[in-house]
Amino acid sequence: MKIPFIAIATVAICASCGPAAQNSTETRTDSATTSAVTQDQMIAPAKEIAPLPQPDTTAILFDTVTIEHPRGDTFDLYVPSGFQVAIAAHGMNRIRFMDRSADGRLFITDMLNLADNTKGKVIILEDPDSSGVFQKQSLYLDKLRNPNSLKFHKDKSGKDWLYLAMTDKLVRYPFNPGDTRPAGDAEVLDTYPDYGLSYRYGGWHLTRTIEFDDEGRLYISVGSSCNVCVEKEEVRASILVMDEDGKNRSIYAKGVRNAVGLAWTHGSLFATNMAADHLGKDQPDDAMFRVEKDRHYGWPYCYHWNGKVYADPKLDTASTKVSPHEVPGAFSYFGAHTAPLGLAWFGEHEAEDPSLKNYFLVAQHGSYSPAIGRGYSIQRVREGNPPEDFVKGFLDAKGNIHGRPCGIFSIGKDDFYFTDDKFGTLYHVYRRH
């Protein structure tokens, strides 16, 4: 399948400063009635943190690429000058996160739809043609409970596994190159609250996300059961850490309402986080954190907005367990309701182009209402600064939604995939040579 494009035209447009910058001059509403804690008043890191390499901060000039989607939609996307974006696969459903096996095939999760269901899949994509379009899609696993995240990992004995995070459990399957179905039964490593979307203490956030550190320890995020509440289950709104076999599980960090994106680089865990929805369309900020062990990141007692931390008036009582002074500052603030999901680091091994090298990329899924108009893009992120658009155009000027970015996966220098879980499409972004 070939995806036609019109000729590329360079457009001298600077990268968006992002919602966080747009909101920086807004006045506080009545919902923020307590004094704020500024970034320099927030608690210092508990340990020495390795600095990240500094990126080039030159503003991005964009090229326009017209996408003719096979579902009948034609729209423009905007990518940095010198880059291209194209459809690599389509015809799937709610595709989320991905990883590549040692034999070069791409494995991708598909949650089917927004409902709590057991019809999820893991799909294998392979045999890309000269245009980078995958010619073969095959089923690896099915009848899964909301599969969101998967990772390939070689354990300390040298055995290969495919790890898969679902609503109710974390499992792993033995894996051999060339496998078209699992090489053995699933080994259950951990289980999680599982009472459905309608149950206050057990519903809401159905996704789980996994990441490994340099020592092979496994991290998994478990979202809250509610918008704002004091949880009954300790694992809610947390990031857990455990050995690669599921043993020695402990809570790594608390107070992260829904950390869907995780990435390990330079000795630290980084996470995106979706904030609560009860304070209006302009607050609180969704954010990204450099996550430290045993820290509490505020939810439900505190929230971030415009670089400051506030006590949530809904829970600001004498029994409040966390004050704004105890909450670490964010790595970057995204603005309200951008819905940050997938997260990936692009260092010297993943990028050469200065517009991408030494930046994180974040998939901004987009606000629950297109009228709010935030997100719907891939943004580059550096510490202490608002995000900047890297791929944009999924929400057009008329309010039409052409996609909702979700997962990001690097496949080489200046070369990556990202998923659109609204229309089941995999996009390929690469630097033209």
What are these regions (language model features)?
Residues C17-A20:
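Bacterial signal peptide processing site
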Residues V37-P80, T207, S225-N227, M242-D245, ...:
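Beta-propeller domain segments
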Residues E68-H69, L114-G120, A165-M166, R181-P182, ...:
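Short, solvent-exposed loop/turn segments at conserved positions within beta-propeller repeat blades
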Residues G72-H90, D127-K143, F175-R200, K232-G261, ...:
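Blade-edge beta-strand/turn elements of extracellular beta-propeller
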Residues M98, L150, D155, I210, ...:
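Hydrophobic core register within WD40 beta-propeller blades
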Residues R105-T109, G158-L164, R217-S221, S268-T272, ...:
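Conserved beta-propeller blade signature
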Residues M111-N113, A165-K169, F175, G223-S225, ...:
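Short loop/turn segments immediately following the C-termini of beta-strands
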Residues Q135-K154, D160, M166-F212, S221-S224:
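Asp-box/WD-like beta-propeller blade repeats and closely related beta-sheet repeat scaffolds
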